[in-house]
Amino acid sequence: MRERGQDSLAGLVLYVGLFGHPGMLHRAKYSRFRNESITSLDEGSSGGSVGNKGSPQPPHPALAPHLPTEDATLPSQESPTPLCTLIPRMASMKLANPATLLSLKNFCLGTKEVPRLKLQESRDPGSSGPSSPETSLSRSGTAPPPQQDLVGHRATALTPDSCPLPGPGEPTLRSRQDRHFLQHLLGMGMNYCVRYMGCVEVLQSMRSLDFGMRTQVTREAISRLCEAVPGANGAIKKRKPPVKFLSTVLGKSNLQFSGMNIKLTISTCSLTLMNLDNQQIIANHHMQSISFASGGDPDTTDYVAYVAKDPVNQRACHILECHNGMAQDVISTIGQAFELRFKQYLKNPSLNTSCESEEVHIDSHAEEREDHEYYNEIPGKQPPVGGVSDMRIKVQATEQMAYCPIQCEKLCYLPGNSKCSSVYENCLEQSRAIGNVHPRGVQSQRDTSLLKHTCRVDLFDDPCYINTQALQSTPGSAGNQRSAQPLGSPWHCGKAPETVQPGATAQPASSHSLPHIKQQLWSEECYHGKLSRKAAESLLVKDGDFLVRESATSPGQYVLSGLQGGQAKHLLLVDPEGKVRTKDHVFDNVGHLIRYHMDNSLPIISSGSEVSLKQPVRKDNNPALLHSNK
């Protein structure tokens, strides 16, 4: 017996049960599964019922920890059974209830459920007398229901099946509610009735900040607007002073639409904010323009913040107030839209093009106007009335409705959709930075006086936004070049353009910048005045043909239309600040830009797409323009 003292309990039991003499009784080794009183096998064999069901006790109770209780009865000792007949029975026992063995394995890893189990055994009125080792071990063969529920809950929260979003293959939905939810995200979008608090300028790229700083930026923006907007829930409690670095990241606040009840529409294409009273579109942020979304701190749990860019506010943090615990549902829906769009992008990158084109062609009135599908602009990015630096000519609210990518739909609210985290990042933005870019344009920036050199890397590299910011180099840069020449034909201006420098400051254009540009353009032979998109494309015959026109539907928006590789390209030339620029250079005027690229045989490149300027299409070749002049 002592030679086998080092063997495990399982090996010892199998040795005794299979090869021991029928007349020998072996004293079981002490185990922490047993009761405090070490009981011999002869005492255990004289015990009463085993378990709650009163099943007969096996002749060898030492096998109970390793075999199911209902199958642990061995043949009688009067008729010894050969070993070959026991092996199939043991195999069937092992395969009959493998969950029992897994439960025993969990108990062997130092859990604290055994004392609790013994306490429940002692309080169980169905048990007879003190709990024997067989009773406690047979009950441990099946894990207690509280433990199973706890483990099952954690597994559901961590497994990929718990996420309702489809994987790389075919979507696997667990309920009709999940299917209905995904259909809304892929189609018209999910609608929530929230309160718009305003937005705060973000002067640095979120990609230049680490994860912790991004969260601090959004929470500081929430705190600022809660203090500025009357009646905000988060303005009552005192908050800690902001971190010093936040003053260089956050800029001015725009409270034009603050406190307004809006309908928030979340889809895989965009986030749209619509005024519930007059159905006016406050903001329409394409999903590519959203980089970060987060909830508030413990004092502002009813708020959701997301960082997006648009031509009016440039990069800004928009704050939404969600009542009745809806904030978690809103942030979860945004995160699911991020993930679902990213998975669609991985399967088929061309879906971005189709999704963006659907936003423009919404109704029959879309054919009556020009669709602004410039390759450096996202469809539907027409800025609304107002904003921090809006110099555009104001548009009527009825015209703005044409840019709405949604239609009126019944407001819906999903109270049970709070499975995901409260902070989300747009993965599609990082994948485009690697090289899978979509030819849609140039990034904008409003104020660069506080802009650091580190965040200049992504300036005009994100193919999502109109080139709406005018940057001018500091005096003395670019070889002390002269200022813009307001008079004379710019075709004969041969000076080099100003190079965009890190730390450059923007000088606001005068209020007469747009009329002044229009006056200059009329002296150019390639300027055709107001011209629709289709009419401009009809004048482009061969590669290298280009012309300059004014948008027929957006006054003050000047477009360079060119033909490259048999495909028409449309590039916005003048930003709302009145500056003419490309990704790397600032030009005095449109003629200076054209002359520079023609003389140096340089194409205009934006987000992987280029337009070569070889031969201008003169206004004499436009019969419609000649007829209007007569």
From Swiss-Prot:
**Which residues lie within the region annotated CH1?**
370-525
Its function, per the record, reads: Activates both Ras-dependent and Ras-independent migratory pathways in melanomas. Contributes to the early phases of agrin-induced tyrosine phosphorylation of CHRNB1.
* Recorded superkingdom: Eukaryota
Single GO MF descriptor: receptor tyrosine kinase binding
Q: How does it assemble?
A: Interacts (via PID domain) with phosphorylated MUSK (via NPXY motif); undergoes tyrosine phosphorylation downstream of activated MUSK. Interacts with GRB2; the interaction is dependent of Tyr-424 phosphorylation and increased by EGF.
Q: Where is the SH2 domain?
A: 526-617
Q: Where is this region: CH2?
A: 1-185
Q: Where is the composition biased (Low complexity)?
A: 125-142
SMART domains per the record? PTB (SM00462), SH2 (SM00252)
For bias type Polar residues, the affected ranges are 471-486, 502-513
Processing and modification events after translation: Phosphorylated; the phosphorylation is enhanced by EGF. Phosphorylation at Tyr-424 is required for the interaction with GRB2.
Gene Ontology terms, cellular component aspect?
A: plasma membrane; postsynaptic membrane
Biological-process GO terms, alphabetical: apoptotic process; cell surface receptor protein tyrosine kinase signaling pathway; intracellular signal transduction; positive regulation of cell population proliferation; regulation of gene expression; stem cell differentiation
Domain PID spans what residues? Answer: 186-369
Q: InterPro entries of this UniProt entry?
A: CEP152/SHC-Transforming, PH-like_dom_sf, PID_Shc-like, PTB/PI_dom, SH2, SH2_dom_sf, SHC_SH2
Tell me the compartments it is located in: Postsynaptic cell membrane
- Pfam families attached to this UniProt entry: PID, SH2
- Positions modified as Phosphotyrosine? Y424
Give the span(s) annotated as Disordered: 39-80, 118-150, 471-514
Please describe the organ and tissue distribution of this protein's expression.
Only expressed in melanomas. Weakly expressed in normal melanocytes and benign nevi. Highly expressed at the transition from radial growth phase to vertical growth phase and metastatic melanomas, when tumor cells acquire migratory competence and invasive potential.
What keywords sit in the KW lines?
Cell membrane, Membrane, Phosphoprotein, Postsynaptic cell membrane, SH2 domain, Synapse
Protein's name according to its UniProt entry: SHC-transforming protein 4
Describe the effect of Y413F: Completely abolishes the phosphorylation in presence of MUSK
